[in-house]
């Protein structure tokens, strides 16, 4: 197996120039069995025989160290993850247990599942799993929680009823929701991103037709919650035509350009005459990247069109990429999780510079949903659930080189990393025999978890900080 495309995008490429792929030897294979034993998670949690099998190889740089067990229902459906290194906490939108799971990133102990409202939001609760009445599968468009993001004491979670749930993490126990704000839609509020100061939040209603994003005021470092809607953002219908189930996906905030960058899986006429769903047969249109300046949006609604280089706003056309995930890495580079789940011809992952729009394709890794840049080791981590050959955790360094891939349970699409300890958290679904449609159809997850209930796998990349060069931007809010 080979990896390709080392590309220092900042300054190395001329405007519009595409990086040339170069072959590099794979740094580590991923087929050896694990040699790691069980690790006790907490005094109240029994040790389990975790980190075995294909998902825990002993010859990779990224090592499986334990599996955190989630009390309650086996994990059938979950969505986005987030880490707050300042609070030493990991958060997971856990639909199976109708809440947001919290794990301590230092002790690796399960802390709680936040499920309901405080006195300030009596009756507030998450939707949980909603099933498709015809197929029995999870209805992703109406289930929740979905996307999560945090700043300081405030955790924000999108829900299946098109609401933004605001959680005060300083409130102990399971009932910490203090506010619920509707986007006005009828389907889930999905992935989201915060500005670095935590005062603005952009969330995507990916399942609406046409899809839209909402810009909210957020709480920053304030002591009380006052979240409200500012603007509903749609994309010009010539770019995202209504009536075909097209979507927008993961936003990311770049503090240098002061823009939100939101992945768009499929856009019309990219290239001209392509199929975005208006024709029979496979999708052939590539995706786009929506660039949003929150200071110039009209209210209460705004429509964004084609990319305008003079304002650095609008939809950038992508090549050979229909992305889901988006994350900001070093030098204002964004890694986009291209996936054959959007365009069957996708075989790579894309890195694009936020300023120049120069780009490079990374070979031998595709199919990502959530992607995350970890400043602690200057690496991207990819939840590649639609990877060719089966779900993997992808590891790409800050110069756009694929380091390794590690097998994961089927549908393992969520990932977040703790930059303080370089621990990577990857939730695993329970086996299909336990939870039904949507469960793990391989034995990989059970080997990682040590149980048949699913878990949150914890990987670690040990770094010599005296020699490591980090990216120059702190991994920020999504």
Where in this protein do the model-derived segments appear?
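Predominantly soluble domains enriched in secretory-pathway, periplasmic, or organellar proteins
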Residues: 45-478
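N-terminal secretory signal peptides that target proteins for export/translocation
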Residues: 1-22
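A detector of low-complexity, intrinsically disordered, Ser/Thr/Gly/Pro/Ala-rich segments
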Residues: 18-20, 37, 181, 193
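Bacterial N-terminal signal peptides
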Residues: 15-16, 23-43
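Exposed boundary/loop context
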Residues: 4, 9-11, 30, 42, ...
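Intrinsically disordered, low-complexity segments enriched in glycine/proline and serine/threonine
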Residues: 5, 20, 26, 438, ...
């Amino acid at each position: 197996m080979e990896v390709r495309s080392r590309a220092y995008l900042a300054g190395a490429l001329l405007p519009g120039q595409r990086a040339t792929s170069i072959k590099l030897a794979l740094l580590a294979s991923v087929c050896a069995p694990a040699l790691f034993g069980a690790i006790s998670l907490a005094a109240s949690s029994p040790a389990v025989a975790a980190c075995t099998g294909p998902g825990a190889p002993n010859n990779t740089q990224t090592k499986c160290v334990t599996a955190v067990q989630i009390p309650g229902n086996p994990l059938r459906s979950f969505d986005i993850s987030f880490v707050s290194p300042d609070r030493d906490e990991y958060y997971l939108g856990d639909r199976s247990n109708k809440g947001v799971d919290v794990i301590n990133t230092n002790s690796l102990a399960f802390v709680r599942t936040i499920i309901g409202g405080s006195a300030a939001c009596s009756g507030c609760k998450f939707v949980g799993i909603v099933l498709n009445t015809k197929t029995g599968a999870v209805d992703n468009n109406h289930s929740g929680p979905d996307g999560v993001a945090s700043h300081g004491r405030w955790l924000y979670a999108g829900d299946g009823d098109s609401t933004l749930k605001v959680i005060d993490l300083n409130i102990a126990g399971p009932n910490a929701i203090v506010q619920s704000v509707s986007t006005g839609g009828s389907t889930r509020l999905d992935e989201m991103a915060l500005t670095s100061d935590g005062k603005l939040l952009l969330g995507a209603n990916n399942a609406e037709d046409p899809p839209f994003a909402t810009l909210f005021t957020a709480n920053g470092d304030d002591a009380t919650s006052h979240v409200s809607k500012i603007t509903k953002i749609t994309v010009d219908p010539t770019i995202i035509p209504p009536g075909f189930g097209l979507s927008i996906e993961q936003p990311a905030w770049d503090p240098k350009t002061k823009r939100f960058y939101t992945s768009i899986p499929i856009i019309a006429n990219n290239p001209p005459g392509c199929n975005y769903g208006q024709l029979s047969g496979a999708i052939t249109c590539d995706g786009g990247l929506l660039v949003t300046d929150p200071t110039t949006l009209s209210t209460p609604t705004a429509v964004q069109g084609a990319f305008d280089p003079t304002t650095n706003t609008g939809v950038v056309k992508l090549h050979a990429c229909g992305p889901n995930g988006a994350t900001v890495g070093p030098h204002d580079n964004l890694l986009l999780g291209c996936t054959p789940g959007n365009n069957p011809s996708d075989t790579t992952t894309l890195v694009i510079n936020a300023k120049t729009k120069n780009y490079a394709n990374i070979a031998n890794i595709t199919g990502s949903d959530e992607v995350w840049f970890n400043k602690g080791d200057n690496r991207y981590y990819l939840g590649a659930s639609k990877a060719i050959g089966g779900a993997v955790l992808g590891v790409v360094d800050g110069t756009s080189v694929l380091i390794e891939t590690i097998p994961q349970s089927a549908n393992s699409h969520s990932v977040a990393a703790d930059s303080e300890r370089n621990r990577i958290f990857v939730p695993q679904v329970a086996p299909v025999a336990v939870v039904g449609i949507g469960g793990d159809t391989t034995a990989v997850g059970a080997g990682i978890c040590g149980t048949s209930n699913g878990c949150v796998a914890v990987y670690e990349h040990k770094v010599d900080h005296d020699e490591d060069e980090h990216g120059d931007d702190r991994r920020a809010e999504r």
